[in-house]
Every structure is written in structure tokens, then in C-alpha cells.
From Swiss-Prot:
Any Pfam family: DeoC
Species annotation: Halobacterium salinarum (strain ATCC 700922 / JCM 11081 / NRC-1)
Lyase as UniProt keyword: yes
Keyword Lyase: yes
Protein name (database record): Fructose-bisphosphate aldolase class 1
Length: 263
């Protein structure tokens, strides 16, 4: 396995992943704010911004659109995912193999694990297979480490987020994608628990420019390696301008006010 810093999805040891798996996970509701984003080409175009180190997409979106963008965008193949129509205990279907993702041209793979769900054991075993196959292809592995389940009362509790980051390390992920636990100190705890596994902040629902940049700044100051963001970029009227601001915070460690000045 090559060092993470040498991976195509890394820029100077940092990552900014543009996520676009929402059509499966959330459905059409996520495209209502900016109707143009229902067209995948509109978001692939956003992903050509220099700040974006990879775009996360499901199988069908990658098959249909990545060939036209392979020279300008690094592909993070999101291997599993389930619709919001599913009403059972949190789980996620494996929709394509690492081997097939590599054939499509993936530069990395992503996999959701719902720690605490009744499906955790099965999902961990599926992650094992994906992680080991990714090693054969020299592809970095990003774990969407999201604790969920009937017994979990607060999925943003600092100890829960730290556990999620640690779980990613223990199971062999190169990057742990976790929710921001609300403060730099709490995020630092998660980063510490992850050891050599890089931690990135999950973007979540759209917030104001300042609020989101402050969360990203808090994560970077805590030692996070970047973020994976979808709605907080492509639900904005001017996504490229907002990426200018994120680029300043993630790669240049600029202040929030400096970043706002670039938007």
C-alpha cells in the first residue's frame, strides 16, 4: 500500500471529497434546493475545481459519467448504499465490487459501516472483503463510520465519534469519515483515537457559510485531514466560490474570515 500522501485523492496530505451519493441515500429531496443538481453532470462539473481531491459516487453515476471526467476528477467509488425508503435497522447493500470499481477507474473506495446497528457484524465482514481487495489494487479505503442503531441515543456524542474513528483504525481504513462532534477538542479526541488513520469531517445538512467554515476550521485545527462534503457545496447558488473558501481553510489553514473573503 502506497503512503496516503502519494495517493491521487490526497493533495499535500489533505483531502476534500465532494460527495454525490445522495440520490440513492436521500432521494430527490436533496435536489429541490438547487434543481440543476439532479443532473449529475452539473455536480461533476463542480468536482473539476482544484480544491476537490476526489468525487464520491455510486456505481451507476460512475459508469455513466466518469469516463467523460476521468482526466479532471479522481473517483472515489462508494461501494455500498441503501435508499431512504428502507425502514429497517440501519444497513447498507454492497452494490459493486472493488474489482469492478477498479475497472471503472476508481482512485479510492468508500464503504459505510453502521457501528451499533444490528447489522454491524455483517457490515464489518463485508468491509473486510472490500478492504482486502482494495489492498490488492493499491486503492485507499475510506470508511463512512456512522454509529447508528436502536440503542444509540446521540450519534454526535464526542465519545461515540471517537469510537467511530477508532473502529475505522481497528478494521483497516485509511480514512475515517465521521460527523463533527461540535468542538475542536472533541474532534481532537477522535483524531487521537484514530492513530495513523486519517480523519475527515462529514459535511451534513447545509448550513450558513460562516457556520460551516467554522466547523471545518475546528476540524482542521483538531488535526483532521480534511472533509467529505456534498450538500454544503452543491446546494449553494455559487458552489465554485464556496470551494474557494474551503480550499483556503483545508489546504492553507486560513482563518474563517480570510476564507469568507474569497467567496
Amino acid at each position: 500500500m502506497r503512503p496516503f500522501e502519494d495517493s491521487p485523492i490526497s493533495r499535500d496530505g489533505k483531502v476534500l471529497i465532494l460527495a454525490y451519493d445522495h440520490g440513492l441515500e436521500h432521494g430527490p429531496v436533496d435536489f429541490e434546493a438547487v434543481p440543476a443538481t439532479k443532473d449529475p453532470e452539473a455536480v461533476w462539473d463542480v468536482a473539476t475545481h482544484d480544491a476537490v481531491s476526489a468525487m464520491a459516487a455510486q456505481k451507476g453515476i460512475a459508469e455513466a459519467y466518469y469516463p467523460s471526467y476521468s482526466d479532471d476528477v479522481n473517483l472515489l467509488a462508494k461501494l455500498n448504499g441503501t435508499s431512504n425508503l428502507w425502514m429497517g435497522e440501519p444497513d447498507s447493500a454492497v452494490n459493486w465490487t472493488v474489482d469492478y470499481a477498479a475497472d471503472v477507474g476508481a482512485d479510492a473506495v468508500g464503504f459505510t459501516l453502521y457501528g451499533g446497528s444490528n447489522s454491524e457484524v455483517e457490515m464489518a465482514e463485508e468491509f473486510r472483503d472490500a478492504q482486502e481487495a482494495a489492498r490488492d489494487h493499491d486503492l485507499p479505503v475510506v470508511m463512512w463510520s456512522y454509529p447508528r442503531g436502536q440503542g444509540l441515543k446521540n450519534d454526535k456524542n464526542p465519545d461515540t465519534i471517537a469510537y467511530a474513528a477508532r473502529q475505522a483504525l481497528e478494521l483497516g481504513a485509511d480514512i475515517a469519515k465521521v460527523k463533527y462532534p461540535g468542538s475542536t477538542d472533541a474532534m481532537s479526541h477522535a483524531v487521537d483515537m484514530a492513530g495513523p488513520t486519517n480523519v475527515v469531517m462529514s459535511g451534513g445538512s447545509k448550513t450558513s457559510d460562516r457556520d460551516f467554515l467554522e466547523s471545518v476550521k475546528g476540524a482542521i485545527d483538531a488535526g483532521a485531514s480534511g472533509l467529505a462534503v456534498g450538500r454544503n457545496v452543491w446546494q449553494r447558488e455559487h458552489p465554485a466560490a464556496f470551494l474557494d473558501g474551503l480550499e483556503a481553510v483545508v489546504y492553507e489553514e486560513a482563518s474563517v474570515d480570510e476564507a469568507l473573503g474569497r467567496i
